[in-house]
From Swiss-Prot:
The gene is uppS. Binds 2 magnesium ions per subunit. Coiled coil: none annotated. This is Ditrans,polycis-undecaprenyl-diphosphate synthase ((2E,6E)-farnesyl-diphosphate specific). Belongs to the UPP synthase family. It comes from Salmonella typhi. Homodimer.
Amino acid sequence: MLSATQPVSENLPAHGCRHVAIIMDGNGRWAKKQGKIRAFGHKAGAKSVRRAVSFAANNGIDALTLYAFSSENWNRPAQEVSALMELFVWALDSEVKSLHRHNVRLRIIGDISRFNSRLQERIRKSEALTAHNTGLTLNIAANYGGRWDIVQGVRQLAELVQAGVLRPDQIDEERLGQQICMHELAPVDLVIRTGGEHRISNFLLWQIAYAELYFTDVLWPDFDEQDFEGALHAFANRERRFGGTEPGDDKA
């Protein structure tokens, strides 16, 4: 899956991007263009996941978060959902050993309780196998929604208040942030969305507060290393203000 000898691109600037999140959109449209069913597009998209993980691991990125299955995706046709679940199992079985060999830590974020027991067991084993790896952290968002993430964090704080461990006046952004998925990782710097749509679709609502957004018309199965590099070039050329103003600009 990963190439240990793949060089860092000579054209890639010192991008300073530690955490990239990707909304992998366009599998269905890609399949339609090929005259195939949507499941064919999802399988083709898995190849793009391999490319993205390899590129991130070899180009100075600490964490890569991929939006694989949203909590709203259960509303898709049952046949497509079933195919996605089987693809998830297949990907874990076929890729996790390669991830482990290349020092990648795999984590699944989202509510996995709705998945069948076979998939839940695969997830637990995959996370356990790679838990102590120190290279790229690969987060797969599955049955994930940004609103769900915030709600589950609030519930955890409510339980602490109910238990008398925490007072309501002690709750602040930092305290809530500690209950949100990936709180121990660097904040998301860049969100990439493929497929031409310009929205975030309930993805990492808390974590992307100050992230840069990059939209491309490229469908996910066609997204390659050059496209990833282009996104990092765009990121490197942006000025991040984090709510402030441009240096030396005193105008409102």
